[in-house]
Amino acid sequence: MAKKPALTPEEMRREALSTALSTIERKYGQGSVMKLSDTAHVNIPVIPTGSIGLDLALGVGGIPRGRVSEIYGPESSGKTTLALHIIAECQKLGGTAAFIDAEHALDTNYARRLGVKTDELLISQPDFGEQALDIADMLVRSSAVDIVVIDSVAALIPQAELEGVMGEMQVGGQARLMSHALRKLTGTIHKSRTAVIFINQIRMKIGTMGYGNPETTTGGNALKFYSSIRMDIRKIQTLKDKEEVYGSRTRVKVVKNKVAPPFREALFDILYGTGISRTGELIDLGSDVGIIEKSGSWFAFGSERLGQGKENVRALLEENEALRLNVEAKLIEHLGMMPSKVVDPDDNAGAMDDDEF
């Protein structure tokens, strides 16, 4: 009987790896470990933000599903407004949204004006931080919710701190809470393809003397590490009509992005009572790329003169829906942006993105 030829070191390594993979699959199930080339490469599923410029700045057309995102900025900068617009876009695509209102400050009438279907929105107003994050975990595990927004990290107070004496120090309690919760949440978020957005506030660092950024966000460093997207939103200009203030010019900077190049910016108007002005973006971006021609203060679309001054053109486009949709279609085609859809998590079961948490 002929002897089997001795295995080369490389063949022995391959056989050992094959045995290990078989053992892992028997113990933990099919697809527990695989080569990246074996998985289905699909476009990252996203939920649009409601802002064309911000979708463009994010590089993938919106907030990625199956990942953690953070929106932070000063007070009254538009953090909750942006989050509500993302919820509205999710609902337009047939998705289910949940809003965990740790601040107990959600204005449902304002949310409705931004396009949120409040009768379909799941809302929770938890008593303490552990409860809020536990509710978020259960919603994500259900795989039946497309987006969960937590407003805000600063309001996620540990139960021990709430039950303590006013003024008593609980050093690092919130940071430990966030670190523990995110360790638990991230794997589930990825499997369920739920988009989870944390709204955060900024604080001034104590003792910073001239070097480095004096601002920091609340809740420790865990959220910074676990977030795939971090957006810094700021009001940069007050919009006035004579003496009447009607909105603010807002800048969003993508300071961290694991799914596309970071440090891109978006500029848009937030109008009081109606939120992000998509029509204003059509004018700004359309002028930048040449879809809308600007001569002095006059604007034109093709052979059609739109009017003089941005506010007059904005009013015209809001009244003339057919014209507005035509401008938007031309702009989106020029920018190469694809329409989004809510993806069933089961469609991409086991699929891996190029960059994990």
Swiss-Prot record:
Q: Which family does it belong to?
A: Belongs to the RecA family.
Q: Which NCBIfam families match?
A: tigrfam_recA
Q: Which gene encodes it?
A: recA
Segments traversing the membrane: none
Q: Which UniProt keywords apply?
A: ATP-binding, Cytoplasm, DNA damage, DNA recombination, DNA repair, DNA-binding, Nucleotide-binding, SOS response
Residues that bind ATP, according to the entry? G73, P74, E75, S76, S77, G78, K79, T80
Name-wise, this protein is Protein RecA
Q: Which organism is it from?
A: Nitratidesulfovibrio vulgaris (strain DSM 19637 / Miyazaki F) (Desulfovibrio vulgaris)
Any GO BP annotation = DNA repair
Note the PANTHER family from the entry: MITOCHONDRIAL DNA REPAIR PROTEIN RECA HOMOLOG-RELATED, RECA
